[in-house]
């Protein structure tokens, strides 16, 4: 059903290629997961080239929970422990403790401050002391193996930024409707046309990666 709705965006492989082009050129993308999973759409931006304007868009039209998708290696580098010892989340979403840049911000909640925290985190030689805990940015630890090991938005963000030739870190936020409900595929498509963001599915990313093994 969803594949028929997304046909206007091309085949699964074309949708991925369009997303990679968008990310490499500093645009956001929209990724929807399985209809039998969360059935939600996330805005995804490459952390490396995300702008304050894009962060403001994510905060305004998203859930407000802005997440930074990191590799396991980066989480170790920053010494970010998991938020809880025993993860009972149904989808095993791997939240670490929340973070804030230790310098260059005020309250940490503005679009500019959140982006400063993200840019600080993804610096090649970032240190644990560069971040305060807790904060207003929610890091997520991606599984090694990406979407081939876990079909989540976290892994899709890391896979897509990597495939786009960028640092393997993505910023994600769920898209919501004006009434606060979660946007589904129809609303996601409308949003994509309004903000010029290509749409694809996590299944598309899996298919693309499988075709390149």
From Swiss-Prot:
Cofactor binding note of this UniProt entry: Binds 2 divalent metal cations per subunit. Magnesium or manganese.
Ligand binding (Mg(2+) 2): 38, 153
Pfam families according to UniProt: DHBP_synthase
GO CC term (a single one): cytosol
Cofactor(s) for this UniProt protein: Mg(2+); Mn(2+)
GO biological process, one term: riboflavin biosynthetic process
Catalysed conversion reaction: D-ribulose 5-phosphate = (2S)-2-hydroxy-3-oxobutyl phosphate + formate + H(+)
Cysteine pairings via disulfide bonds: none
Chain sites annotated for binding D-ribulose 5-phosphate: 37-38, 42, 150-154, 174
Site entry (Essential for catalytic activity), positions: 136, 174
EC number: 4.1.99.12
MF-aspect GO terms: 3,4-dihydroxy-2-butanone-4-phosphate synthase activity; magnesium ion binding; manganese ion binding
Binding site for Mg(2+) 1: 38
Alphabetical keyword list: Lyase, Magnesium, Manganese, Metal-binding, Riboflavin biosynthesis
Lyase keyword on record: yes
Record bears the keyword Manganese: yes
Family of this protein: Belongs to the DHBP synthase family.
Biological role stated in the UniProt entry: Catalyzes the conversion of D-ribulose 5-phosphate to formate and 3,4-dihydroxy-2-butanone 4-phosphate.
Protein's name in the database: 3,4-dihydroxy-2-butanone 4-phosphate synthase
Gene encoding the protein: ribB
């Amino acid at each position: 059903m969803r594949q028929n709705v997304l046909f206007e965006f091309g085949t699964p492989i074309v949708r991925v290629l369009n997303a990679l082009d968008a990310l490499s050129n500093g645009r956001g993308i929209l990724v929807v997961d399985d209809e039998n999973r969360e059935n939600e759409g996330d805005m995804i931006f490459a952390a490396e080239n995300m702008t304050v304007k894009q962060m403001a868009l994510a905060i305004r039209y998203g859930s407000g929970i802005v997440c930074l998708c990191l590799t396991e290696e980066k989480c170790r580098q920053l010494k970010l422990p998991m938020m809880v010892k025993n993860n009972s989340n149904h989808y095993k979403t791997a939240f670490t403790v929340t973070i804030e840049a230790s310098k260059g911000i005020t309250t940490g909640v503005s679009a500019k401050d959140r982006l400063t925290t993200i840019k600080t985190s993804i610096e090649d030689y970032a240190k644990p002391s560069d971040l305060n805990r807790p904060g207003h940015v929610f890091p997520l630890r991606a599984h090694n193996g990406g979407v081939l090991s876990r079909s989540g938005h976290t892994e899709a963000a890391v896979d897509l930024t990597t495939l786009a030739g960028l640092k393997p870190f993505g910023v994600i936020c769920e898209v919501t409707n004006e009434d606060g409900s979660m946007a589904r595929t129809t609303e996601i498509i409308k949003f994509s046309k309004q903000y010029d963001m290509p749409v694809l599915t996590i299944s598309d990313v899996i298919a693309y990666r499988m075709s390149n093994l």
